[in-house]
Regions:
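A charged, aromatic-enriched C-terminal amphipathic alpha-helix characteristic of glycosyltransferases
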Residues: 355-385
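Nucleotide-sugar-dependent
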Residues: 235, 280-285, 292-315, 322-333
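Acidic anion/phosphate-binding donor-loop and adjacent secondary structure
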Residues: 157-163, 192, 205-221, 263, ...
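Conserved donor-binding/catalytic core segment of Leloir-type glycosyltransferases
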Residues: 218-235, 240-244, 253-255
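Membrane-proximal helix-turn-helix segments that form the acceptor-binding/catalytic region
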Residues: 32, 112-119, 123, 162-180
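Nucleotide-activated donor-binding/catalytic signature segment of Leloir-type glycosyltransferases, i.e.
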Residues: 261-283
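Carbohydrate-associated surface elements
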Residues: 186, 201-207
């Protein structure tokens, strides 16, 4: 990174982060902050989630993972190396935050553990950055000079969450925050601290990582159609079933954690679930794919999201078909929009027959404007304006 680039980044700060687990999977807050890692001192706090666990394989694995990591503080998922200037803090916590006594115990544990880490690192002055609603219980307890909220989702509408509890948490979080960013225009309109402007900060992309180059298509061979990312209730399974049944020769590949029922999809011989793939290995795995698809159910939750994977798919330089959510429709000149199964099927047929878009313009735009470094610079500039 050039010295000119460095000058625009936040530097020489002590920062507490409340977000998803460090290095567990490629999430937006970690992507955003990664360009700032070398220039600041960090305490990264891993708390429990806001959803009460259920008796499922996924949740049991998460519980085991959490228990294991409590005893190995600097070990991350997939063994990712943690820089020396980042201290990972994993307070001992109990799920079921909806119960007042447990919530108070968790707050005590977090404050005690983080306080010790701050003292050990000699961090007397700090700022906090957070992207999860339950951070409301902890921010402001560490005498921060600035409290920064990066809102990445409408968490209160997530399936399985306690709407009232999460809504109250986020209302308190917004009230405590000095600076608020939102990753979509719809979130920007609804997330305000009542004191200052909420800034639009859309997701970036690690462009070079995903720019795998074009691939020639053949009408004589089955298409390899790909979805990678978290597969959950937001994913439109009807679209996938209709593609699989209408185009039985084409092969659909799904990479990522699955956290919803997929019983109906597993009946199709041309739908393949491969499980999660480490972020570093994704380019190699997806290099054989012809088309990337983002099929979403349309509802209040998805209308608020800005899919993190969208720009990653576009950066491949290969055809992308996606449900026309508001943040996706903004890229209508760079991809194929599909509002139902028939749209997706017709686009796939047209692409196989030779239809194409000017991907070079897309790639040039993403490389020049949408990298995570560019996002980190904007993020830094707004913070620097407000630091004492």
């Amino acid at each position: 990174m050039s010295s000119a680039s460095q000058e625009q980044l936040l530097k020489d700060q002590n920062i507490i982060v409340f977000g998803e687990d460090f290095g567990r999977h490629a999430h937006s807050l970690e992507h955003l902050l990664r360009p700032l890692f070398p220039y600041n001192q960090w305490i990264w706090v891993e708390t429990i989630g806001i959803r009460s666990p259920k008796f499922s394989i996924y949740d049991l694995r998460r519980i085991f993972e959490k228990l294991t990591k409590w005893f190995k503080p600097q070990v991350t998922h997939e063994g990712i190396e943690v820089p020396e200037n980042i201290t990972i803090v994993r307070p001992l916590m109990i799920p079921f935050n909806q119960y007042g006594i447990i919530r108070r115990l968790n707050r005590w544990s977090v404050n005690r553990t983080v306080g010790r880490a701050l003292q050990a690192r000699g961090m007397a002055t700090v700022l906090s950055i957070y992207s999860i609603p339950n951070a409301a219980d902890y921010i402001g307890d560490f005498n921060e000079t600035l409290k920064v909220y990066v809102c990445v989702d409408e968490f209160s509408l997530w399936p399985g969450l306690n709407y009232k509890m999460v809504k109250n948490m986020e209302d308190l979080l917004l009230k405590k925050s000095d600076l608020v960013f939102a990753t979509s225009k719809s979130l920007q309109k609804t997330k305000s601290n009542g004191k200052s402007e909420t800034f639009l900060l859309t997701h970036g992309v690690e462009f070079q990582h995903f720019n795998i180059g074009p691939k020639a298509l053949s009408s004589n061979h089955p298409l390899q159609i790909c979805y990678f990312g978290l597969f959950d209730e937001r994913s439109d399974q009807k679209i996938l079933k209709d593609i699989a049944s209408s185009l039985p020769e084409e092969q659909i590949h799904i990479y990522g954690n699955v956290v919803c029922s997929i019983d109906e999809l597993t009946n199709f011989k041309n739908i393949h679930f491969h499980g999660p793939v480490p972020y570093k290995k994704l380019p190699q795995v997806i290099s054989a794919m012809d088309i990337f698809i983002l099929p979403y159910v349309r509802n209040e939750l998805t209308e608020n999201i800005n899919p993190l994977k969208l720009k990653e798919y576009l950066s491949t330089g290969r055809p992308v078909i996606a449900t026309g959510l508001p943040e996706v429709a903004a890229y209508k000149d760079h991809l194929y929009l599909g509002n139902d199964s028939q749209d997706f099927i017709e686009h796939i047929k047209a692409i196989k027959a030779g239809k194409s878009l000017d991907t070079q313009k897309t790639l040039e735009y993403l490389a020049a404007n949408e990298t995570w470094v560019a996002k980190a610079k904007f993020f830094s500039s707004e913070i620097l304006k407000r630091l004492p």
